[in-house]
């Protein structure tokens, strides 16, 4: 349904709804005295062209009295292709205190130029790249990409990790964060809270 929502403009309202929902949940955890961890929220390329998008998201997070460091914004690499307007928007989001994550890196678009021009805090390696692990040339490619991003001062998150072989290889690359079914499938809030309690014990 995402392509349909992007065509009819409803994706803007959906993005805002999800952003508000995450802010509301973070605020609830804060009231409960839990240690807050950053939560990433996707923002579509259509929303990025919405007028006053930065001010809108700033206003929402202020309404919940939250620090913007607890909400990270993920944009897909397809939204960054040779676009000065997006470049300026990312700088505005950074000025507002948001961290910007480049999602789906390596999923089919040319992102190397974007790494050079745009200030991303983190790149998220797409599962299609992680699946190269076990292939000599694929592993060399992953090694080169991570070293390049790290040389720009960016953190690395690997997506779609499903095997211990993938986990060990990515740990050896000094990936900052690793996510995937190897650890857990997406969880409802209550189950996530239980897992978090167990991890902290």
What kind of feature is each model-predicted range?
Residues 1:
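Conserved, function-defining core regions and hallmark residues within catalytic/recognition domains
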Residues 10-86, 160:
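Catalytic core of bacterial c-di-GMP phosphodiesterases, primarily the EAL and HD-GYP domains
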Residues 44-51, 70-83, 96-201:
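EAL-family c-di-GMP phosphodiesterase catalytic domain
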Residues 57-67, 90, 116-119, 171:
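Acidic (Asp/Glu)-rich catalytic clusters
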Residues 58, 87-91, 142-146:
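Short amphipathic alpha-helical segments and helix-helix/interface helices
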């Amino acid at each position: 349904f995402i392509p349909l929502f992007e065509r009819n403009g409803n994706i803007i309202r959906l993005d805002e709804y999800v952003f508000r929902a995450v802010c509301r949940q973070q605020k609830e955890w804060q009231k409960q005295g839990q240690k807050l961890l950053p939560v990433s929220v996707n923002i579509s390329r259509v929303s990025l062209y919405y007028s006053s998008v930065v001010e809108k998201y700033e206003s929402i997070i202020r309404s919940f009295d939250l620090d913007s460091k607890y909400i990270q914004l993920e944009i897909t690499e397809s939204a960054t292709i040779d676009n000065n307007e997006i470049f300026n928007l990312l700088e505005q989001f950074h000025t507002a205190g948001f961290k910007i994550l480049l999602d789906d890196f390596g999923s089919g678009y040319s992102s190397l130029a974007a790494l050079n021009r745009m200030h991303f805090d983190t790149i998220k390696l797409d599962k299609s790249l992680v699946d190269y692990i076990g292939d000599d040339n694929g592993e060399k490619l992953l090694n080169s990409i991570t070293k390049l991003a790290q040389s720009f001062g960016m953190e690395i998150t690997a997506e779609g990790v499903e095997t211990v072989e993938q986990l060990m290889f990515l740990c050896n690359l000094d990936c900052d964060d690793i996510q995937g079914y190897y650890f857990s499938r997406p969880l409802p809030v209550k189950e996530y809270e239980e897992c978090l309690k167990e991890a902290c014990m």
